[in-house]
Amino acid sequence: MVDVVETLPLFPLGTVLLPGASLPLHVFEPRYRQLTIDLVTGTIPGKQFGVGAVREGWSPDDGREGLHDVGCTASLREVRRLPDGRFDLQTTGDRRFRLVDVDDSTAPYLVANVEWLPDDEGDTPTDLAPFAMAARAAHRRYCTTAWRQQGGGDGEMPADLTDEAATDVADPELAHILAGDCLLPLSDRQELLEETCPMQRLQLIRRSMTREAVLLAELRAVWAPSAKFAVEHSPN
């Protein structure tokens, strides 16, 4: 059951923000500078805004049609204003939403009406445990393969170099955290974001990381974002 519709400022990006993941932003466009100012001054309460991924072949300026339906809120953690008026932001993904409609006339930036997108209920910790174990194993294989390709040697990646951020994460949120430090295609990350079944989500991330580990090992290749979005931090 979805919640009531709420209003959220929207920041279209060429990436998918996942709950619990960190997202640094370098803000230089005037409209998003204004969004940052509105967040910092409290004009927009809660210091949160929505991040929506731009569809392949579309532009951030294409409005509602150019965005995926499901996005994630970003919580503003740190703000550094640069002398020329630009901003460096540190944000963290929080809550998933589904776009209802988008207003491009009220503010310099997009403002969206959204419905919150909760997880399905029913899976117990016991149900999820084997899927979580398999996902963690796939994540370690991916990280070990990446470590070897970067000159780390032929053995297992040392335990003290493994990202332990997900050690105490509950299984329903685990897939998002594991995906946070892997270079996965935008389509994979978007599918992961849209999936509301924790068990299916763990299976999705396991398959994605297994495939990417093979590509790393055999082709020494990883997915790279489109050049149109390859700018400092994330585009705006």
Task: Specify the residue positions occupied by each region the protein language model found.
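N-terminal low-complexity, acidic/polar interaction/targeting segments
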Residues: 1-236
